[in-house]
Regions:
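Conserved core of the PLP fold type I
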Residues: 65-203, 220-221, 225-236
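Helix C-cap/helix->beta junction micro-motif
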Residues: 31, 147, 207-208, 354
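N-terminal small-domain helix-loop-helix segment of the aminotransferase-like
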Residues: 12-108, 293-294, 401-402
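PLP-dependent enzyme catalytic core of the Aspartate aminotransferase-like
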Residues: 85, 90, 349-358, 364-402
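Generic structural signal for small/hydrophobic residues in well-ordered secondary structure
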Residues: 24, 40, 57, 80, ...
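Conserved glycine-rich beta-strand-loop-beta hairpin in the small C-terminal domain of fold type I
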Residues: 287, 291, 306-315, 324-337, ...
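Conserved core segment of the aminotransferase class I/II
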Residues: 234-308, 312-317, 401
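A short helix->loop->beta-strand "cap" motif at the edges of active sites that frequently abuts
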Residues: 128, 207-210, 238-239
Length: 402
């Protein structure tokens, strides 16, 4: 049985409930880096903050003195909707008043969306389930558990192009599915779903009545073809499709904590009801910055140029080692180091000998029922440092691992 045909079933262990970065700190904490530390572990962009951020904040500091509306300011919603229409081939423009909602970054939105999805769908037979790729962004699993749903992990491997195999999901699982988390570009592998994939997933959502939660936060980091959106294949009413965006990666603003959800009108309305009670509002001055950010592409193009340089360096320095492939999107490199040892040992070795901090792939994934961990044997590198530092880290990695 190939990895891509393994049954997608709910599973987990005690460690699976914990942050991979807490586990990484515990692994590396007792040790000292062998060389001056370079961290490629956390996906925190280190490129410069756009020049307009300071002046816009200064202009709107008085707005810190009032409570924001949870829906978001009208200028922000209009700017985000206009950006979506210009960036993607949508069936029609989204209504900024009813089909788009500001978020404190995408993470809290992705978490609360699971709770909304459980209310959005009709009753399920048996235990309601939320499907997600494996490896995956940990908030997906946390959201599923908070919604009293069973997280179902769909292995993403080299055999299935690092995207969930939609044809491997059994009908009983689909019948009890509440939501399907999809990341495109994927974290950590950088794979991108094509239109046919989105269309097939939408067909399943329509047939079984679940909602697609499309995490598209890496969509603006690419070096070749621009990734598409699930909204492009959602139909004129965007029914059962909600896309999530963020300025953290696109605009080098992880500290701004501004993103949005857009799509299905009914879902967005229910989402707003929940967030009016359970979620903190986004400060108005930060929404002013985000409004300007979504109206400017020059800084995004410069951002892509800098990442392109670093992926060119990875092409040259890593070459054909460790199953390296230039990702279709995002800024992560997913290396297969299984022939050199297990991923946890490799991570510790790189830290102790090379002073390079990476993430073991097994920490980003969960065990399938048969004991298979799709992240085992891999390490993830986030190419977020400047070009010179990135080159130094990659040279150290190759020199250490051979």
């Amino acid at each position: 049985m190939t990895a891509s045909s393994r049954a997608p079933q709910a599973s987990g262990s005690s460690d699976s409930e914990r942050s991979p970065f807490v586990r990484l700190n515990e692994l590396l904490g007792p040790h000292q880096p062998g060389k001056p530390l370079i961290t490629l572990a956390v996906g925190e962009p280190q490129h410069p903050v756009p020049d307009f951020v300071g002046p816009v904040l200064a202009k709107h500091t008085a707005d810190f003195g009032r409570y924001p509306m949870n829906q978001g300011t009208e200028p922000f919603r209009k700017a985000a909707s206009a950006w979506l229409s210009s960036r993607f081939k949508l069936p029609r423009p989204l209504d900024p008043a009813s089909e788009l909602l500001v978020l404190n970054g995408s993470r809290e939105g992705l978490f609360l969306a699971a709770i909304t999805a459980a209310r959005y769908v009709s009753p399920r037979p048996g235990k309601p389930a939320i499907l997600m790729p494996n490896p995956f962004y940990p908030v997906y699993g946390a959201g599923a558990r908070a919604a009293a749903c069973e997280p179902v992990y769909l292995p993403t491997t080299v055999e299935n192009g690092f995207l969930p195999d939609l044809d491997a999901i059994d009908e009983a699982t689909l019948a009890r599915t509440v939501a399907f988390y999809l990341a495109s570009p994927a974290n950590p592998q950088g794979s991108v779903a094509k239109p046919d994939y989105f269309k097939r997933l939408k067909q399943l959502a329509d047939r079984y009545g679940f909602v697609i939660l499309s995490d598209e936060c890496y969509s603006e980091i690419y070096t070749r073809e621009a990734p598409g959106s699930a909204l492009e294949c959602a139909g004129p009413d965007f029914t059962r499709v909600v896309a999530f965006q963020s300025l953290s990666k696109r605009s080098n603003l992880p500290g701004l904590r501004v993103g949005f959800a857009a799509g299905d009108k009914k879902f967005i309305g229910m989402f707003l009801e929940l967030r009016n009670i359970a979620a903190p509002q986004v400060p108005v001055p930060l929404q002013h910055v985000a409004t300007v950010a979504y109206g400017d592409e020059a800084h995004v193009e410069e951002n892509r140029r800098l990442y392109r340089i670093k992926f060119d360096l990875a092409d040259q320095i890593i070459g054909n080692r460790y199953g390296y492939r230039r990702p279709d999107g995002g800024f992560c490199v997913w290396l297969n180091t299984s022939e050199l040892g297990d991923d946890v040992s490799i991570t510790l070795r790189l830290f102790k000998e090379a002073g390079v901090r990476v993430v073991p792939g097994s920490y980003l994934a969960r065990l399938q029922p048969d004991g298979f961990n799709p992240g085992a044997g891999y390490i993830r590198l986030a190419l977020v440092q400047d070009g010179e530092t990135t080159a130094q880290a990659l040279h150290r990695l190759v020199e250490t691992l051979g």
